Regions:
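Short alpha-helix
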Residues: 168-183
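A short glycine-rich, Lys/Arg-flanked "PGG" loop and its adjoining helix->strand segment in the class I
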Residues: 128-143
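Class I S-adenosylmethionine-dependent transferase superfamily signal
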Residues: 67, 134, 180
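A short His-aromatic
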Residues: 119-123
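Short, glycine-/aromatic-enriched active-site segment of Class I SAM-dependent methyltransferases
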Residues: 146-169
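C-terminal helical/coil "lid" or tail adjacent to the Rossmann-like core of SAM-dependent
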Residues: 200-230
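Conserved N-terminal segment of class I S-adenosyl-L-methionine
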Residues: 1-110, 114-118, 128-131, 166, ...
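Conserved S-adenosyl-L-methionine
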Residues: 185-196
Length: 253
């Protein structure tokens, strides 16, 4: 069994393989990153009841499916044909559809109440233009949600970015805020942080847990249990301070 390929997919749905470009559900070793992304989707879904939602760069489609639990209509858009086909086959419910397209050009002006663009702004060559395009897609009173990793917690100390080859640029809080404000009149910035088991794990590491489990030779079995047990309850969103946030989530209007 390939540890980097999705397990137990529905009949007729081709599994996707991890490439580092996007996270996936149903890959036990990837569960931390999947839940970290999913936590933000769930938070947005709770605020999108009855809305017309556009989920840009939806990838595997799991986030679009979460949004569709509360929204009136969700369209998930991705430019990767393999991911698009997987999402279209796997996630079927009334009000949910998937389209193949480019985030820079998809959509008609004023067509959506909510635009979602998570963990992708760091991948695009002209982020300001993309955000201006999203602004044009919003109906009056609409909101765009954009998230990106915090370079200060993702990259090595002092580095301009992490070693993720898919990331063209990574942002500090003030840089990401300025980027969003270049396209939107109103921007509220939140940070995603560890909570629950992950917060306890952070504290344990500061007390030397990494040396202890290495010395006891239980690293592999411990994380073989711990990583699959992580849930979205092990993350929380709050406004400040943002220096140590895992990810930034911008609410733009």
């Amino acid at each position: 069994m390939n540890a980097y390929v999705q397990q137990n997919q529905p009949p007729g749905v081709p599994p996707l393989e991890l490439t580092g470009e996007r996270t996936l559900p149903d890959v036990p070793t990837e569960n931390y990153w999947y839940r970290r992304h999913l936590a933000v989707y769930e938070w947005i879904a709770a605020r999108a009841a009855g809305a017309r939602v556009l989920d840009m760069a939806c990838g595997e489609g799991y986030g679009s499916a979460v949004l569709a639990r509360s929204a009136a209509q969700v369209i998930g858009v991705d430019g990767n044909p393999e991911a698009h086909e997987h999402a279209r086959l796997k996630y079927t419910r009334p009000g949910l559809s998937f389209e193949w397209g480019a985030v820079e050009t998809y959509g008609e002006p004023g067509s959506f109440d909510v635009v979602v663009f998570l963990q992708t702004i760091e991948h695009v060559t002209d982020p300001s233009a993309v955000l201006r395009h999203f602004r044009s897609l919003l109906a009056p009173g609409g909101v765009t949600y954009v998230s990106t990793p915090n370079v200060l917690t993702l990259a090595p100390p002092g580095a301009a970015k992490s070693d993720n080859p898919w990331h063209l640029r990574e942002y500090r809080a003030e840089e990401f805020t300025a980027l969003c404000e270049s396209a939107f009149a109103h921007v509220q910035m939140l940070g995603l942080f560890h909570a629950g088991k992950l917060r306890a794990h952070e504290i344990a590491l500061r007390l030397g847990w990494d040396r202890l489990h290495a010395g006891l030779r239980i690293t592999k079995p411990f994380y073989g249990w711990f990583t699959p047990a992580i849930s979205t309850r092990d993350f929380t969103l709050r406004a400040a301070p943002l220096t140590h946030a895992l990810d930034f989530v911008a609410l733009c209007a």
